[in-house]
Swiss-Prot record:
This is Aspartate 1-decarboxylase. GO terms for cellular component: cytosol. Substrate binds at T57, G73, A74, A75. Catalyzes the pyruvoyl-dependent decarboxylation of aspartate to produce beta-alanine. SUPFAM superfamilies: ADC-like. It is found in: Cytoplasm. Is synthesized initially as an inactive proenzyme, which is activated by self-cleavage at a specific serine bond to produce a beta-subunit with a hydroxyl group at its C-terminus and an alpha-subunit with a pyruvoyl group at its N-terminus. It catalyses: L-aspartate + H(+) = beta-alanine + CO2.
Length: 126
């Protein structure tokens, strides 16, 4: 059996621009894409921390080193510049490989610089 598992996550990325008329859905700095293993045209899920919007789109390459997170086309209606978002990609992982599977997680500051990388999410305690 294959399970859909979190593959890569950009946590608390800041939307740097919105382009309603631009072709493509979410342009992300290539350095950030590579950090979490998200590929060009790969399906991504975007969770807007500011307004609760959750939507599915796809990633396109943004200029390397720009720290760009640009919501384009219809996705531009879901976010404003400066909004904090979580961007996730998922992958099918065979149940037999779950023991060695780890997601690639990157935590960002307000300027979309990576401040921390992890392979797991800490245990939440009561």
């Amino acid at each position: 059996m294959q399970l859909n598992m979190l593959k890569g996550k950009l946590h608390q990325a800041r939307v740097t621009q919105t382009e309603l008329e631009y072709e493509g859905s979410c342009a992300i700095d290539l350095d950030l894409l590579e950090a979490v293993g998200i590929h060009e045209y790969e399906q991504i899920h975007v969770y807007n921390i500011e307004n609760g919007e959750r939507f599915v789109t796809y990633a396109i390459i943004g200029e390397r080193g720009s720290r760009m997170i640009s919501m384009n086309g219809a996705a531009a209606h879901k976010c404003n510049e400066g909004d904090r978002v979580i961007i996730c990609a998922y992958a099918g992982v065979p149940e037999s490989e779950l023991g060695e599977f780890q997601p690639r997680l990157a935590y960002l500051d307000a300027d979309n610089r990576i401040t921390q990388r992890r392979g797991s999410i800490p245990l939440q305690v009561a």
